[in-house]
Amino acid sequence: MKDVLLIKYGELALKGENRSFFENTLVKNIKYALRDFDGVKVEKTHGRIYVECEKDVEEAIERLKKVFGIVGITRAKEADLDLEEIFKAAVDLMKSHQGKTFKVETKRPNKAFPYNSMEVSRRVGAAVLKNVKNMKVDVHNPDVLLNVEIREKAFLYAGVIEGAGGLPLGTNGKATVLLSGGIDSPVAAWMMMKRGVEVEAVYFHSPPYTSDRAKEKVVDLCKVLSQYGRGMRLHVVHFTDLQLEIYEKCPARLTTIIMRRMMMKIAEKIAQQNGSLALITGESLGQVASQTIESLYVTNSSVSLPVFRPLIGMDKREIIDIAQKIGTYEISIRPYEDCCTIFVPKHPATKPKLEKVLEAEEKMDYQKFIDNFEEEVIEI
């Protein structure tokens, strides 16, 4: 008998012919998450993934809770396919639940085992009642559900720790997120990562109008997001010269939308260089002037790559709730301005016309900035 972590996954089981690809990617991501743990073994057999961890089990569980594709983690007992060994495992597991009501549920994928599920449940329950003090059976509303799985070995567990869910990172291609340092864009990145998308980030830095602390904030956000993946690459684009060009030569009410279009063009160029097939933004419909449906239409027309906006139908409270859950909120609210909050016009256009925007852009030579932007790449 030994202790293992039993990894449960949801959507992967529905992937048909591609199932092994998703499972193997999940195994790779689990190994990466536990890469600095000694004596860790990760094994995939018959629709289950098992993790053996000699020490620091609680820390291992905390790491695994951030691995996309895992819906649940259980601390399980692994026993030989022998009833007496199964009884010992059940008693050992249930000693920490003395005085509670319980129910035993058995699954028997291994049909070669000579006892059916009902018989295993009955016998395991009897062993618990005999050897653990003050236990009572309640088949309708038990305090503890003791699960028994009969596979190549027997696995027993009670209780499931919730995982991050979603799909394993790296199973749905790559995209590039425009990361501002605010509340929204890190949440948008996290939501796409949850769908299996590998993410690189672009941050637009405008010194001296934005400080190094603003850049450090974005680096810290990437560090949090990287805990859900396999590291992250951050592209820091120096945006001051192009931003000044916009505000000197374009109508004030159009400067915000034109700035967004220039950011999209530069982000698209970076995305195409790093193999991304889409851009990600943290825009939510109607939240600010640049996020009306008319503004988003004009913004989209600046690029050819698809633009994913996972927050588009969410309100601010919903976004903040996720930011707090994933650990980015306290970083995002640090009081350092990003380039989107400087030079903001008093009355930005909320329903810009594409032809008017294109006409305004002709007044400046933006292409030279896009072709020759200064970039710093930070590996996180």
Swiss-Prot record:
Q: Which reaction does it catalyse?
A: [ThiI sulfur-carrier protein]-S-sulfanyl-L-cysteine + a uridine in tRNA + 2 reduced [2Fe-2S]-[ferredoxin] + ATP + H(+) = [ThiI sulfur-carrier protein]-L-cysteine + a 4-thiouridine in tRNA + 2 oxidized [2Fe-2S]-[ferredoxin] + AMP + diphosphate; [ThiS sulfur-carrier protein]-C-terminal Gly-Gly-AMP + S-sulfanyl-L-cysteinyl-[cysteine desulfurase] + AH2 = [ThiS sulfur-carrier protein]-C-terminal-Gly-aminoethanethioate + L-cysteinyl-[cysteine desulfurase] + A + AMP + 2 H(+)
Lineage of producing organism: Bacteria, Bacillati, Bacillota, Clostridia, Thermoanaerobacterales
Extract the InterPro entries matched here. Rossmann-like_a/b/a_fold, ThiI_AANH, ThiI_fer, ThiI_N, THUMP_dom, THUMP_ThiI, tRNA_STrfase, tRNA_sulfurtransferase_ThiI
Into which family does the record put it? Belongs to the ThiI family.
* EC number(s) stated in the UniProt entry for this protein: 2.8.1.4
Question: Top enzyme class of this protein?
Answer: transferase
Q: List where this protein forms a coiled coil.
A: none
| Presence of the UniProt keyword Nucleotidyltransferase in the record | no
Q: What are the annotated GO cellular component locations? A: cytosol
Q: Which UniProt keywords apply?
A: ATP-binding, Cytoplasm, Nucleotide-binding, RNA-binding, Thiamine biosynthesis, Transferase, tRNA-binding
Q: Which residues bind ATP?
A: 178-179, 203-204, 260, 282, 291
Q: Any S-S bridges, and between which cysteines? A: none
Q: Which HAMAP family does its entry note?
A: ThiI
Q: Name one Pfam family in it.
A: ThiI_fer
Q: Name one GO biological process term.
A: tRNA 4-thiouridine biosynthesis
Q: Which NCBIfam families match?
A: tRNA uracil 4-sulfurtransferase ThiI
What is this protein's gene name?
thiI
Q: Where in the cell is it found?
A: Cytoplasm
**Species, as recorded:** Caldanaerobacter subterraneus subsp. tengcongensis (strain DSM 15242 / JCM 11007 / NBRC 100824 / MB4)
Query: Main subcellular localization, coarse class?
Result: cytoplasm
Summary of the function given for this chain in its UniProt record: Catalyzes the ATP-dependent transfer of a sulfur to tRNA to produce 4-thiouridine in position 8 of tRNAs, which functions as a near-UV photosensor. Also catalyzes the transfer of sulfur to the sulfur carrier protein ThiS, forming ThiS-thiocarboxylate. This is a step in the synthesis of thiazole, in the thiamine biosynthesis pathway. The sulfur is donated as persulfide by IscS.
- PANTHER family xref list: TRNA SULFURTRANSFERASE
Question: Could you tell me which SUPFAM superfamilies the record lists for this protein?
Answer: Adenine nucleotide alpha hydrolases-like, THUMP domain-like
Entry keyword Membrane: no
Domain THUMP intervals: 58-162
Q: What terms describe the molecular function in GO for this protein?
A: ATP binding; CCA tRNA nucleotidyltransferase activity; tRNA binding; tRNA-uracil-4 sulfurtransferase activity
* Name of this chain's protein: Probable tRNA sulfurtransferase
The pathway where this protein functions is:
Cofactor biosynthesis; thiamine diphosphate biosynthesis
